[in-house]
Amino acid sequence: MKKDTHPDYHFITVQMNDGSTYKTRSTYGSEGDTLVLDIDPTTHPAWTGGGQQILDRGGRVSRFKKKFGFIGS
């Protein structure tokens, strides 16, 4: 492989919503950083049967519904 063409690949810690953590390799951040997930397999509707609502932390869903709410009606 060519030098300096690929991002640094290192170990990080991933923290799920329930507080559990695991280590994996990633290009995210730098060695030893922690990635805190907003939505993970324990809370995502695709894996939980769709009973839970997705948390709208950034207001994106609200803005979308406000702008395009008439589409699904």
From Swiss-Prot:
Protein origin, superkingdom: Bacteria
InterPro entries documented for this protein: Ribosomal_bL28/bL31-like_sf, Ribosomal_bL31, Ribosomal_bL31_A, Ribosomal_bL31_sf
Keyword rRNA-binding: yes
GO MF terms held by the record: rRNA binding; structural constituent of ribosome
Keywords per UniProt: Ribonucleoprotein, Ribosomal protein, RNA-binding, rRNA-binding
Pfam families on file: Ribosomal_L31
An individual GO BP term: translation
Gene3D superfamilies in the cross-refs: Ribosomal protein L31
One GO CC annotation: ribonucleoprotein complex
Free-text function comment from the UniProt entry: Binds the 23S rRNA.
Binding partners and assembly: Part of the 50S ribosomal subunit.
Family: Belongs to the bacterial ribosomal protein bL31 family. Type A subfamily.
NCBIfam families the UniProt entry points to: L31, PRK00528.1
Protein name (record): Large ribosomal subunit protein bL31
Organism expressing this protein natively: Parvibaculum lavamentivorans (strain DS-1 / DSM 13023 / NCIMB 13966)
Lineage, uppermost ranks: Bacteria, Pseudomonadati, Pseudomonadota, Alphaproteobacteria, Hyphomicrobiales
Gene name as annotated: rpmE
